[in-house]
């Protein structure tokens, strides 16, 4: 982890979002700020559905650089701001390389990702942030 934080500092990044796992499955997002060291700034429990789980077969090329993340907020409460902060996104952003769609669901907030350069439909994965209203 120390090497990851050093690399982030060297490249001028202000945050590192870590997907923590349990028994090989995503279990939480952990946010580190490189200048604060190995102290977790925020942790959010999650569940995830992969592209395969969602039945998506369209090939999606990864973005190889930091892109702008726009947020489409359908939740409208403090949970939206917390999730946007994890990803370094502003709730006011309306255009970006990736659009993060936040919707309320039974367990908390469903996070879907849309890549306007590929499709107007979600491209996966689908993440549920387990957060109470």
How should these model regions be labeled?
Residues 1-133:
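Phospho-regulatory, Ser/Thr- and acidic-rich intrinsically disordered linkers and terminal tails
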